[in-house]
């Protein structure tokens, strides 16, 4: 048996780890939202239809932040369809996953869920089929206290206080040909820059996240990041590094070696 020795010195600190790297996300995909975190009428749910068992597990994990509403779903997302009286919300074809979205669970329900879960919100905006103006509007709805059209609309929906969301993701996987509103790196870099700039005019206290390439196997990996940062570096706060690591083959050694891929990503992508 091979042996190794590890020396740990808790006083040797190289930097502070941002707790948000341990965040998660929820998307309108399969049973993730409907039945996963929301199931009205279930014995497992509270008075709002929020699954108590799921909430308990998320609180136990102390998940610091959760991204919503997607994922590929966000590229066709009309946030205004998901707010207001539930019986007035439109059911529409959801083209990312090929289902009908009822909008029974929406933006305000997720804000309530996040409070109960003890998690902050990372809100994603639609840069696939929409753009800067829509991102500005949803920010106004979420973060303005009162006295404007969208802030007063939120108040009319029963939410007097703003949600005060501080972290905003600018689209999702925009280099993927599967994405609604798929863009080239230059196209995405420009719209990300202009969207972030407009949103920060509205609320200078927010932070924004530009989308990196969808994964290591993408032909645009690396060059995508260089190009979009040329366009939006001065306007955004973070770049998301996107890659899924799993162990479907039950090969623990191979799975643990995924850390090498993480290191490769950091070494390959542009750094400052």
Locations of regions flagged by a protein language model:
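Generic cytosolic/nucleocytoplasmic N-terminal low-complexity/intrinsically disordered segments
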Residues: 1-2, 271
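N-terminal catalytic cores of secreted or lumenal carbohydrate-active enzymes
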Residues: 2-246, 250
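Active-site clefts of carbohydrate-active enzymes
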Residues: 250-253, 267
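Beta-propeller domains
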Residues: 253-263
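Conserved small/polar residues in nucleotide/adenosyl-binding loops
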Residues: 265-271
